[in-house]
């Protein structure tokens, strides 16, 4: 497994810092925990930004951090990321906030230290754009949504 050095700053000066941890040796995502002063109740349909208390510095622009929902929270309670996937750019230095939506039918309570999302580090390619008169032909062409599943 490849690794990178990620510098972390703990933005909560009133609490002891907690470094993110991988749940298992083969885990791709590191768990992010809620950093709360009190319990937070998320009502059905409500979107909230949950603080983690962490800010990171990625080693270079060729790496991005991506925040994903935790599968258990999504499948058991309907707790999903409000923006689908969170993207943390290499030049962002603010606190990592996790925007979640309760898509379930019951209120969901988040406590300090609860694992609320997972963060994965991935290579990032910067596009160099240029204008073309036309694009190369392919077998798929302009077929969009569901076009490859139709016979």
Curated annotation (Swiss-Prot):
This enzyme is involved in nucleotide metabolism: it produces dUMP, the immediate precursor of thymidine nucleotides and it decreases the intracellular concentration of dUTP so that uracil cannot be incorporated into DNA. InterPro entries: dUTPase, dUTPase-like, dUTPase-like_sf, dUTPase_trimeric. Pathway: Pyrimidine metabolism; dUMP biosynthesis; dUMP from dCTP (dUTP route): step 2/2. CDD domains: trimeric_dUTPase. This is Deoxyuridine 5'-triphosphate nucleotidohydrolase. Belongs to the dUTPase family. It is an enzyme of class 3 (hydrolase). Substrate binds at residues 70-72, 83, 87-89. Its cofactor is Mg(2+). Pfam families: dUTPase. One of its GO terms (biological process) is dUTP catabolic process. NCBIfam families: dut, PRK00601.1. Keywords: Hydrolase, Magnesium, Metal-binding, Nucleotide metabolism. Its EC number is 3.6.1.23. It catalyses: dUTP + H2O = dUMP + diphosphate + H(+). GO terms for molecular function: dUTP diphosphatase activity; magnesium ion binding. The keyword Hydrolase applies.
């Amino acid at each position: 497994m490849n690794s990178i050095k990620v510098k972390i700053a703990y933005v909560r000066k009133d609490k002891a810092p907690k470094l993110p941890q991988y749940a298992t040796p083969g885990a791709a995502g590191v768990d992010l925990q809620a950093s709360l002063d009190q319990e937070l109740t998320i009502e059905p349909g409500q979107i909230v930004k949950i603080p983690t208390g962490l800010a990171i510095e990625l080693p270079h622009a060729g790496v991005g951090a991506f925040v994903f929902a935790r599968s258990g929270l999504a499948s058991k309670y309907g707790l999903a990321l409000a923006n689908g996937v969170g993207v943390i750019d290499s030049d962002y230095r603010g606190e990592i906030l996790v925007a979640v939506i309760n898509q379930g039918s019951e209120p969901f309570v988040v406590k300090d230290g609860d694992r609320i999302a997972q963060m994965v580090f991935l290579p990032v390619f910067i596009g160099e754009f240029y204008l073309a008169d036309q694009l190369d032909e392919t077998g798929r062409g302009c077929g969009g949504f569901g076009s490859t599943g139709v016979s």
